[in-house]
Regions:
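N-terminal secretory-pathway/extracellular module detecting exported/lumenal segments
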Residues: 21-85, 94-160
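Residue-level detector of buried hydrophobic side-chain packing
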Residues: 88-90
Length: 160
């Protein structure tokens, strides 16, 4: 019984570590991937619409999660264009009025053809600069709208 349990535990650890290749063509052709921000710094941000979900909502916070692709376009100055596949969690504290926060739960890196370059996880929570309208803010606004039916700006207007 112990041996079976340890084999199951090992399988649970090893299987998620395998990275499934994804190319730029696959991202563009998938109807669930919505381009949110294009052209700035030769980077396009796609959100996998099918991955958007509410994580937590109560009297204190809104939390939503989604898979985001950050794709460096071929016209960038780099010789090796890349793709980041990122699982992100956006959080808004209603009571604290601390703005939008972002936690990166996992990152998988690929070259343009879809060959895996590496994987990372659990990047700490960071504040998103709402005033600058940075890409993380625009992406987060879209994710909140899809998850809750309202954008981040409207959430902040209606807080108590």
């Amino acid at each position: 019984m112990k041996k079976l349990f340890s084999m199951l535990l090992l399988a649970c650890i090893v299987i998620p570590l395998q990275i499934q290749a994804i190319s730029m063509e696959a991202i563009k052709n998938d109807k669930n991937n919505i381009p949110i921000l294009t052209g700035k710094n030769a980077i396009t941000y796609f959100v996998d619409k099918s991955s958007i979900k509410r994580i937590e909502e109560n009297q204190f916070i809104y939390k939503a999660q989604a898979v985001v692709y950050e794709v460096e376009n071929n016209n960038s100055r780099r010789t090796n264009s890349y793709i980041h596949k990122v699982l992100v969690t956006y959080r808004y504290d209603k009571q604290a009025s601390s703005g939008m926060k972002l936690t990166i739960n996992s990152v998988e890196d690929f070259n343009y053809k879809g060959v895996a370059l590496g994987a990372f996880s659990n990047i700490p929570e960071q504040y998103v600069d709402v005033t600058l309208r940075d890409p993380k803010y625009v992406v987060g606004n879209y994710i909140f709208k899809e998850a809750y039916g309202t954008t981040f700006e409207n959430m902040t207007l209606h807080k108590k």
